[in-house]
């Protein structure tokens, strides 16, 4: 008889051939669990960045590379990126806060006619959303800080704009879905992050240097 053992790493099966149905169900269960973890750890709001970095790291390492354990990977990465993510949170909060300060009074004017200033602010918001859509996955993989992180983000946007746009659209779709149905928090964070990883990992591998980064992990280079 086939014995099944469930763990956060996945279903361990005594048979040599893994059942693809169980594998799929296990990954779906892990995505739901990660979505719940992300939601709980994001409740203080200021921890959203650290939670997102931890979510991305865990999705790639545990779900896609089948290494490490889910809880250990998530909370280790949450701690590792906590302070840096706070600084990033403040930058984006100030940026979008300033845009909102000038945009909200223009909403009534926009309803009665075209307001070039309002649409200019919307354009600036879209520009800000591009780096926001992948900055937390980036800090989960690379050790750039300050100006080096800004240069890296701009380089990726310049060379892989279509990928970044895809990530931004995924993020926007996920936010809209959660706003329309809060119960979607049970799966949206994990699913959006998983799909984003399919777009971002080929890009990140191009800039992962095993010979120059002492913190390089070998699974970074796996397909």
Please name every model-derived segment.
Residues 3-121, 130-223:
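Helix-coil boundary and N-terminal low-complexity module in membrane systems
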């Amino acid at each position: 008889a086939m014995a099944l053992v469930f763990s956060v790493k996945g279903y361990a099966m005594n048979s040599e051939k893994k059942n693809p149905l169980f594998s799929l169900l296990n990954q779906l269960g892990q995505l739901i669990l990660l979505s719940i973890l992300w939601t709980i750890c994001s409740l203080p709001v200021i921890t959203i960045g650290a939670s997102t970095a931890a979510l991305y790291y865990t999705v790639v390492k545990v779900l896609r590379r089948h290494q490490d354990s889910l809880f250990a990977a998530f909370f280790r990465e949450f701690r590792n990126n906590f302070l840096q993510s706070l600084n990033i949170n403040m930058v984006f909060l100030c940026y979008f806060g300033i845009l909102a300060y000038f945009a909200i009074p223009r909403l009534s004017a926009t309803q009665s006619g075209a307001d070039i200033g309002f649409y200019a602010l919307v354009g600036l918001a879209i520009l800000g959303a591009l780096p926001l859509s992948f900055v937390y996955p980036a800090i989960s993989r690379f050790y750039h800080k300050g100006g080096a992180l800004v240069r890296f983000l701009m380089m990726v946007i310049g060379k892989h704009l279509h990928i970044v746009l895809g990530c931004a659209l995924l993020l926007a779709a996920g936010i809209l879905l959660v706003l329309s149905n809060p119960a979607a928090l049970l799966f949206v964070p994990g699913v959006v992050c998983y799909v984003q990883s399919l777009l971002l990992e080929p890009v990140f591998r191009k800039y992962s240097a095993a010979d120059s980064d002492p913190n390089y992990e070998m699974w970074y280079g796996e397909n």
